[in-house]
Amino acid sequence: MPVINTHQNIAAFLDMLAVSEGTANHPLTKNRGYDVIVTGLDGKPEIFTDYSDHPFAHGRPAKVFNRRGEKSTASGRYQQLYLFWPHYRKQLALPDFSPLSQDRLAIQLIRERGALDDIRAGRIERAISRCRNIWASLPGAGYGQREHSLEKLVTVWRTAGGVPA
């Protein structure tokens, strides 16, 4: 469960994202995925313990994650990229990269995709479709990374307490 107190369907959607992004069941996580750093091409899982800022905020090099040399700074339960962190940290007045800040940022990204009302109303398939350009693991994202099936994610969402329309 996310740490933020929010609508049941939104909490379930956040849990679904964590499963989809591979952080909820990450082999090293000590904090429900909030401490996960993207796994690079070397395949070595990694976590962080300092929540004062995004793990890539102070010059840490991005991790190469495929043979094409593409790099990522994805971190935390929702694999949030450092590229967008300074903007949202300021916009949302986030004091740190704590679990609560990560939840608030994820909800803001969902809001910007116009999916919050769909999630609240239980229109999960539509919400997933609206958010697929944010999270590479969602079906139809098209980032060339592993995508989960819509059926699997709907099942995860329902198991996490999501109530369909």
Swiss-Prot record:
Reaction it catalyzes: Endolytic cleavage of the (1->4)-beta-glycosidic linkage between N-acetylmuramic acid (MurNAc) and N-acetylglucosamine (GlcNAc) residues in peptidoglycan with concomitant formation of a 1,6-anhydrobond in the MurNAc residue
Entries under SUPFAM superfamilies matching the protein: Lysozyme-like
GO BP term, pick one: defense response to bacterium
CDD domains in the record: lambda_lys-like
Protein keywords: Antimicrobial, Bacteriolytic enzyme, Cytolysis, Host cell lysis by virus, Host cytoplasm, Lyase, Viral release from host cell
EC number: 4.2.2.n2
Positions annotated as active site in the UniProt record: E21
Compartment annotation: Host cytoplasm
Predominant location category: host cell
Keyword Acetylation found: no
Entry-linked InterPro entries: Endolysin_lambda_type, Lysozyme-like_dom_sf
GO MF, one example: lyase activity
GO CC, any one term: host cell cytoplasm
Keyword ATP-binding among UniProt keywords: no
Assembly mode: Monomer.
Function: Endolysin with transglycosylase activity that degrades host peptidoglycans and participates with the holin and spanin proteins in the sequential events which lead to the programmed host cell lysis releasing the mature viral particles. Once the holin has permeabilized the host cell membrane, the endolysin can reach the periplasm and break down the peptidoglycan layer.
Family: Belongs to the glycosyl hydrolase 24 family.
Protein name as it appears in the record: Endolysin
Encoding gene (name): K
